[in-house]
């Protein structure tokens, strides 16, 4: 996926997550991501916010390594064990009891379809998941059950910004592309606007902080819409 190029600065084979391209000299060695490097080398806090299920391509590209982006049974445990401070997104059914037990044993608070719990949480390590797999499109979202991507972004920034060494946060409006594939222009536009509000939250923090870079990029930046018969 293209996200690997962003977070590792290295091209890869289509369908992989953060491993070197097929080459006998490299033999599928993992590529370190900017999230992992920031954490290991500079002690930065790290976070992921998204609306797809957590082992899906873009969140996984920041925090896991696999020759097949669809192998959630490999990818999900890697993400759980990667010591990411804050994870907010979809995928309640994918978080197994063993994974949840590991998180709880290592100081995380875990919330599953618990909006009030997430809002009240003051711990610096948190996983909050909503929806059996992916979260709802913003236009279909029940605001009493699932947070907006803007709220998720603000919650993550509030937690991560307490680290004196700074932080790395990836925010993905995951389902803009899904709606485009599904010929759903209303879903696409409303999810894009929801993501725009999340970008506004990040830019607001950056302006006030003065030491934060915000990079906004598309990985499905299609140039037009066409309707076929």
What are these regions (language model features)?
Residues 6-13, 24-39, 44-61:
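Mobile, glycine-rich extracellular loop/lid and propeptide segments
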Residues 1-4, 10-13, 18, 55-229:
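A post-motif C-terminal structural segment
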């Amino acid at each position: 996926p293209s996200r690997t190029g962003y977070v590792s600065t290295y091209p890869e084979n289509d369908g992989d997550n953060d491993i070197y391209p097929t080459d006998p000299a490299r033999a599928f060695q993992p590529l370190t991501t900017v999230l992992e490097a920031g954490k290991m080398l500079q002690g930065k806090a790290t976070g992921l916010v998204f609306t797809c299920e957590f082992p899906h391509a873009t969140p996984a590209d920041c925090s896991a390594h696999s020759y097949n982006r669809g192998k959630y049974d490999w990818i999900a445990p890697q993400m759980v064990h990667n010591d990411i401070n804050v994870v907010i997104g979809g995928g309640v059914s994918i978080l197994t009891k063993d994974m949840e037990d590991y998180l709880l044993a290592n100081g995380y608070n875990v919330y599953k379809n618990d909006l009030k719990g997430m809002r009240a949480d003051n711990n610096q390590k948190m996983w909050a998941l909503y929806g059996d797999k992916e979260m709802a499109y913003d236009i279909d979202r029940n605001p009493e059950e699932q947070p907006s991507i803007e709220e998720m972004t603000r919650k993550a920034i509030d937690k991560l910004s307490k680290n004196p060494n700074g932080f790395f946060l990836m925010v993905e409006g995951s389902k803009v592309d899904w709606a485009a594939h599904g010929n759903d222009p209303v879903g696409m536009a409303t999810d894009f606007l929801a993501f725009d509000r999340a970008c506004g939250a990040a830019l607001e923090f950056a302006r006030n902080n003065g030491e934060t870079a915000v990079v906004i990029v598309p990985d499905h930046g299609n140039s037009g819409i066409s309707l076929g018969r």
